[in-house]
Amino acid sequence: MIFEHEIPSGSKLYFGESAKVKRDIEYVSSEILDNLGFEEIVTPLFSYHQHESFDDKKPLVRLNDEENNEVTLRADSTADVVRIVTKRLGRSTESKKWFYNQPTVTFPTTEQYQIGAEIIDGSFEEIARTTITLLNEIDTQPVMQIANIRIPHLLNEKYGVSLEVLKSMHVEQIMAADLPWIDQLARLHSVDDLNDLSAFPDDIKEELKKIKEATKKVEYANMVISPLFYAKMRYYDSLTFRMFENNTLLATGGIYTIDGVEAAGFALYTDECISSKMSKEEDK
């Protein structure tokens, strides 16, 4: 039996202080992004093309329009923003920097509020620094973990290391690879660990250099590297970052390609930021 006051699992309810914190985070972030030259965009909740961004269609909430064409509720803002800006708005706008403040919805009843931004032809360091600026403004300095998705793909394609093993971080299985440098690769953690890359083959070394250059340009004190990090990401294909406070993921971002368009972007997870801010207020 479902009572009248019940809300579906995974959906969000904010009221009183939590609603105020949500409003403050969204307002401050929007003002900062506007001052940094980003244009705001609100994309439709309904989409004809979300399924093109998902290999696994299970997260999509699907329904049909009046002509029985399949539509889905917005499960990913990034792909829609890039496609709308480049293919629908086209020459009607010269801006390459866009931000949004809107939720995503995934099956069965999960809502996630996000503040995100995309820069067409953007750089990793600009999008990373922008994310840091927003998080600083809401009084949090999480750990930034930088990775390069190309490294796991090279390990899989050229050196026989399974992506599933990397995804699950089975260290023993990774170490079992007959590669004299794999142990050293797994031990890379701090920015200083990138000072000597002589042990690695040229292709791996080249991708590690990209991480090294990114750390120099971003200039953030609370930073670690994770060259073996792998997750099945829909369009990220090179440098990525994740920002954690304790074990809570507050933001992700990086550089990516969608429909041949190269861009950089991030998503700040508003719900987690609200919890973080309220927890700190309670501790005072």
Give the residues covered by each predicted segment.
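Beta-rich nucleic-acid/ligand-interaction surfaces
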Residues: V42-L60, A147-E157, N222-V224, L228-S238
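Acidic, His- and aromatic-enriched active-site or binding-groove loops in soluble protein domains
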Residues: V61-D65, G160-A177
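TRNA-binding/sensing appendages of the translation machinery
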Residues: M1-E70
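Short, surface-exposed amphipathic charged segments that create phosphate/polyanion-binding patches used
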Residues: K158-L163, L239-R242
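Extended cationic-aromatic binding surfaces that line active-site or macromolecule-binding grooves
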Residues: E67-V82
